[in-house]
Regions:
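Sec-dependent signal peptide cleavage junction
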Residues: 18-35
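Transition segment at domain starts
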Residues: 43-50
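N-terminal Sec-pathway targeting helices
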Residues: 1-13
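Short beta-strand segments within Ig-like beta-sandwich modules, predominantly Fibronectin type-III
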Residues: 98-104
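Extracellular/oxidizing-compartment recognition motifs
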Residues: 93-97
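Histidine-/acidic-rich catalytic cores in large beta-rich domains
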Residues: 33, 38, 54-84, 88, ...
Length: 639
């Protein structure tokens, strides 16, 4: 018995020594933790106060959330509830903006539309007095894009602004009718830009779940840059969303585990961030039919827009790589009809294609399909190749893009073209990718040809980044009753443009931002790597420029590699080793709609592997396997 106790004690001591020695071997430096924007803004919110400030001596904070330089916040208290009106003086009537806020005794007045590098004059009025405030702003960044040409008929214009999200170099921003910059963000928030019913904007986050542009989700923000909600989406967000009548969001996403992209839609419950419905287009449409020249096995549909019509319970999707716009019943997920050239589609699907009734031209590689108030359908017809048959392809220099409106007769399965603009402008208006058309009112449209590009004076038939363009252009045209009343030309490519007022239901709320939604568990490798033999960081390791950061809900490992490199990430803790594949490749994209995240301009690839913290717990040492060698980094991560 005594021997057994001694033996057991020795075993316990051995285990303790093993654990201590293991921890000594494993103990390194903690990885750098990247503070999220939500966390940064929580600290800012704590410092914003009305207490002790009055109408005559207000608290004035320029760029309060540090990402929207042409905004400010004026905070003060009044003895009794009052209505406050603010006016931002412009250079003329069309560029002067006013807004009246709800009655209260604690006033948080957001100031939008400041000029850059300017001593702006702001007039605030209470019910009993008036005060002038001057706010001096900093110059624009040196790389800011300014218009090269403005055409306007002022008698038809309103004092709204033209908002943009970039596709290439540039900023998410807004220009007034003079072409002056009146708002911009310093963060890379992209894709669709429009107002929610509550007046907030919904833009992408500035982090990726996957190359080249699938962001972690969406930020609901105001023009100050304050984030109210972050919606995390495991498959990422791209291109477009739609706010439903019940407040839920229909979002274009991916099912990254099935080997294809841009063919998956999720409905997000705004109250909790949960996904309450999904649509997988691989179960609805054939992947091998109706292919355009840009179709790939990976990106076979390339869904670039979504619209929901509550009256008919249909969703409208634009598939660039099948040259179709498809209407689905949202409940049954069955096809209602397909708009597009039926060439190269089987008899099984021919029954869904609408029959033209007049001299209709089909759309090719379209974007931004929408259902108008009267049931008509508008879209931007990019027009790539203008045929499904290679022998009939139209060259870019002979091609054109246009805004189009179609009228669909569902009962007779026919379609009529009732409006177009852009064809008359020829190749100078030709955008082979991105772009937009917005219905402003009957006979009043905003048509945005956002992806015009040239190389050596020749107009390109591919996205600017894929064609190594040396000249970029976007043209946004406002049309009223067939007359161009405004046009702005910018020397860059812009994904979308929206005409919107500066203020819309803008009651600032000093509440902390909330993150909703979650990421799934990151799949581990089928091939494990033993840690019996490893090297410390050395010159060979350092040439890969490895950067390791911990984000709020995941680990990010970035490095610069060659396409043939074999890389794995190993997270190791006692009795808990995890190995993850780091795939060093990029897919052959034929539609690089947004190039703002792309750092891979050279032969080597700078890529990031994300490991979600779901199911991970405790302290892990970080090893990196590269081409047969295991490197023990100097870092650990704690989940």
């Amino acid at each position: 018995m005594k021997k057994l106790l001694i033996g057991a004690s020795a075993l316990v001591i051995l285990i303790i020594i093993t654990l201590i020695s293991y921890n000594i071997v494993q103990a390194n430096n903690p990885v750098t933790e990247k503070t999220s924007l939500i966390s940064i803004q929580k600290e800012i919110d704590k410092k914003i106060s009305t207490y002790g400030y009055t109408f005559d001596n207000p608290n004035i904070i320029l760029n309060p959330y540090e990402i929207s330089p042409l905004t400010a916040l004026i905070a003060f208290e009044t003895k009794s509830p009052e209505i406050i009106t603010i006016t931002i003086k412009g250079k003329d009537k069309l560029t002067t903006y006013s807004h009246t806020f709800d009655k209260t005794d604690k006033h948080y007045i957001p100031v939008y539309g400041l000029y850059p590098n300017y001593n702006n004059e702001i007039i605030i009025k209470s019910e009993t007095k008036e005060k002038v405030i001057n706010i001096k702003t900093e110059p624009l960044p040196e790389d800011f894009i300014l218009p090269t040409n403005i055409t306007k008929k002022e008698e038809y214009l309103t004092n709204e602004l033209y908002f943009y999200t970039p596709s290439s170099k540039g900023y998410t921003c807004a220009y007034d009718t003079n072409g002056d910059v009146r708002w911009y963000l310093t963060k890379n928030f992209i894709w669709e830009i429009s107002r929610l019913k509550n007046g907030h904007l919904l833009l992408s986050t500035d982090s990726l779940v996957n190359y080249p542009y699938y962001t972690t989700g969406l930020f609901e923000i105001d023009l100050l840059g304050k984030i109210y909600y972050e919606y995390l989406i495991d498959g990422g967000y791209h291109h477009d969303y739609y706010e439903m009548e019940n407040g839920n969001l229909l979002v274009l996403s991916n099912n990254l585990s099935d080997g294809t992209v841009e063919d998956y839609i999720v409905e997000i419950d705004r109250k909790n961030g949960n996904i309450v419905n999904t649509i997988d287009l691989t179960t609805i449409l054939p992947q091998e039919e109706g292919k355009s020249a840009n179709s790939t096995e990976y990106d076979w549909f390339h869904n670039n827009s979504i619209w929901y019509d509550e009256n008919t319970n249909q969703i409208l999707l634009s598939g660039r790589h099948q040259d179709i716009v498809v209407s689905l019943d949202y409940t049954t997920k069955k096809i209602n009809y397909i708009i597009g050239d039926p060439t190269n589609w089987s008899s099984e699907y021919q029954k869904y294609f609408l029959t033209p009734t007049n001299n209709l031209e089909w759309q090719y590689a379209s974007h931004a399909a929408k259902i108008l108030p009267n049931g008509d359908i508008s879209l931007f017809d990019n027009g790539v190749n203008r045929s499904k048959e290679e022998k009939n392809y139209l060259k870019a220099e002979n091609n054109y893009s246009r805004g189009v409106i179609y009228r669909v007769d569902k009962e007779n399965m026919t379609i009529t073209q009732i409006y177009q603009y852009g064809k008359e402008r020829g190749s100078s208006y030709y955008s082979p990718y991105i772009s937009d058309m917005d219905y402003l009112n009957d006979g009043h449209y905003l048509i945005h040809s956002g992806g015009i590009s040239y190389k050596n004076g020749q107009i390109l038939n591919v996205p600017a980044s894929l064609g190594e363009a040396d000249t970029l252009k976007s043209i946004t045209t406002e049309i009223l009753n067939n007359e161009v009343i405004f046009e702005i030309e910018l020397p860059t490519n812009n994904y979308r443009s929206e005409k919107m007022p500066l203020y819309q239901k803008d009651n600032y709320h000093p509440t902390e931002g909330i993150t909703l939604g979650s990421f799934n568990k990151t799949e581990t490798s089928k091939n494990q790597v033993p840690l019996i033999k490893y090297k410390k960081e050395n010159d060979t390791y350092n040439k890969y420029n490895i950067v390791i950061e911990k984000e709020t809900n995941r680990l990010a490992i970035t490095g610069t590699f060659s396409k043939n490199d074999k890389v794995k990430i190993i997270l190791d803790k006692f009795l808990g080793k995890k190995t993850y594949d780091f795939i060093i490749s990029t897919r052959p994209y034929t539609a690089m709609c947004v190039d703002t995240f792309n750092n891979n301009k050279e032969e080597k690839l700078t890529l990031t592997k994300y490991i979600n913290n779901t199911t991970l717990n405790g302290k892990y040492s970080i090893y990196i396997y590269i081409n047969g060698t295991v490197y023990k980094t100097n870092y650990y991560v704690n989940f």
